[in-house]
Amino acid sequence: MQTVTLLAFLVFLFTYALISVRRVRSVSIERPAAALFGALLMVLLGVVTADQVVEAIDLDIIGLLLGMMIIVSCLEITGLFDRVASTMVDRCGDRFTLLWVSMGITALLSALILNDTVVLMFTPIIVKVCRSIDANPIPYLVGEALAANIGSVATGVGNPQNAYILIQSGIPFTEFAIALTPLAVMSLLVAVAIVALVFRKDLFDEGLRPHPIDRSLLAAASPKVRLEFPFFLVLGVLIAVFIGFLASSWLGMPVSLIAFLGGCFLLLALPLVKKDTGTGPILRGVDWTLILFFVGLFILLKGVETSGLMALMLGSFEDMGAGVAGVAGLTVVSSVLSNLISNVPAVMLLSPMIPVGDDTLWLSLATSSTLAGNATILGAAANVIVVEKGLSMGAEVRFLDFLKAGLPVTLVTLLMSVLLLGL
């Protein structure tokens, strides 16, 4: 092994260890800081040159994420999530209905916009609604986290790792959605059933009849929201962006450019029609830490590639192909890595090992890295957000509370994924 390859290997191991443990003694190390430090070491040790740093950063992925984040920030400012809560309230007459409606809405929104943002906005609403009807919020919070991850599987913009896979694989947005939406729908049904079974005492009486709830109490917890022109402007742009995604092949424009143009338009237009909103609040709604995390990983993995380390790693996967065996093998590796180092770095590490043009394995990587995150609280960022937000409002989701629903959901949905994509 050459010196540069050995250096790249040591930096790679050190950085991924930091990303995994997120702590050095008593000092907390956030994932973006760990990734950027690894990138810095690659440059300082001469593994990556200055020119290669610029070359490593994939502007397509950054543009897609940034554009969608700006649009979501504008939706939040104009009251989308309050309106969704009001709609949810109107449809619920018992606790089980509240569960499947809240999970369904969470999954749908997570397919359209980044799932982390959905749970960030939706968790306080769920806790507030549960408190108003004297219901245990734990089943609803666990269901929300599972639904957010499952719903995000359906499209290339539901979560960061899917956005990365969408760009790297070259799979058209429409084909991506058509291939994975059925799996997402079936997985959601499985999740609703398992959550209802695990938490049946909170949802049903002894005769297995759903506990009724007083809609007037729900209405008080989530009053009607008046929608004004700024909301419809943002919603119109979101719809236009998704139409652009569907027609991206015909338009000859990458989805990243479509999302970025939509975000830029709203960044300028929304402050003009909503006088109490400037560009500052919109930009504060962007997850800049995720952008920096991607930048650091891009440079780190460029070092892995240029040093020859990637070629050594790829040798172990030369015989991986489609079919049940190939999909199952990738699913196991991806699932384990996603729970050890989180799904985004796992996907970026495994993606060079996918044979060129093998859409089945790309889709398998998307499903396994996302669905595996449902196993434990730490398996996905959305889970952590739900748990931390709930805890801040006095609703504690314990590790076992999550595990007893999340683990069976993960095992069943991963098996469904292997069968659906492998056969």
Where are the regions a protein language model picked out?
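Interfacial loop-to-helix junctions that mark the boundaries of transmembrane helices
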Residues: 1-6, 26-29, 51-61, 173-183, ...
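Hydrophobic mid-bilayer segments of alpha-helices in multi-pass membrane transport proteins
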Residues: 6-16, 26-47, 59-70, 231-241, ...
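Hydrophobic alpha-helical transmembrane segments
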Residues: 9, 36-37, 97-104, 118, ...
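Hydrophobic alpha-helical transmembrane segments in multi-pass integral membrane proteins
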Residues: 46-50, 156, 160, 240-246, ...
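Membrane-embedded alpha-helical segments and adjacent helix-loop junctions characteristic
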Residues: 51-138, 290, 295-358
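Alpha-helical transmembrane segments and, especially, the helix-loop junctions at the ends
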Residues: 110-120, 137-174, 179, 191-196, ...
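Juxtamembrane and boundary regions of transmembrane helices in multi-pass small-molecule transporters
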Residues: 135, 174-222, 375-378, 382-423
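Long, contiguous bundles of hydrophobic transmembrane helices that form the permeation core
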Residues: 188-278
